[in-house]
Amino acid sequence: MSGHNKWSTIKHKKGAADAKRGKVFSKLIKEITIAARMGGGDPDANPRLRTAINAAKAENMPKDNWERAIKKGTGELEGVNYEEFQYEGYGPGGGAVLVESLTDNKNRAAAEIRHIFSKCGGSLGEAGCVAWMFDKKGYIVVNQSVTDEDTLMEIALEAGAEDVREAGDVFEVITQPDDYDAVKEAIDAAGIETEDASVTKLPQNTVEVTGKEAEQMVRLLQTLDDCDDVQNVYTSADIPDDAIGED
């Protein structure tokens, strides 16, 4: 596994605009609902739900909102029946793209995702064509201005992290999914502020994408992420900072 998770950086830069459009809350509510449906409404016994609730709290979602989403997932309240699907393909420049969809209409989602790939210069592939290139990991980003590497490494590794590495002006903490909560809590307890933290999928290897293809790749990723039926987008593309535009 190598390379900075650039798509996470892109989403972080664009996060404020997404929040204004309500997309962050909408995606979190979907995730909480399906996590509760699949694993029950007790976050202590449901790691996926616990992670989703923590993400909602980090975005300052009102407690009533996520509690209602849990009840819809467990059936206590009537709600939309979301299903999970995965789409795989390649973007401009050859970077792998993995798309996770939570939708109440598979046909609509598939058609829209296929259209986005085509419109933005990508190609949608068969199931299994790129999923094997990604590993599910806990991923925590800490700016180097708030702590030093030795301090962060000691805290993170003691809590169960598998790696701490330098990437530009940040440190990346990598964990197994089951260890993510404990590591994040240990970093928070030490008073170290995090820039980004989630259970995500990281590429085992990255593909450098530059120039016009990098700009096209960013457009593909952002258009996919803006789709209401898309929950998460992952890529193996290593995109230069100058291709990552501000909103």
Curated annotation (Swiss-Prot):
GO cellular component: cytosol
Major subcellular location class: cytoplasm
MF term (GO), any: DNA binding
Residue ranges the record marks as coiled coil: none
Xref: Pfam families: TACO1_YebC_N (PF20772), Transcrip_reg (PF01709)
Domain of life the protein comes from: Bacteria
Subcellular location(s) per record: Cytoplasm
Matching InterPro entries: Integrase-like_N, TACO1_YebC-like_2nd/3rd_dom, TACO1_YebC_N, Transcrip_reg_TACO1-like, Transcrip_reg_TACO1-like_dom3, YebC-like
GO biological process: regulation of DNA-templated transcription
Keyword presence, Transcription: yes
Keyword terms of this UniProt record: Cytoplasm, DNA-binding, Transcription, Transcription regulation
Family recorded in the similarity comment: Belongs to the TACO1 family.
Protein name: Probable transcriptional regulatory protein Dalk_2958
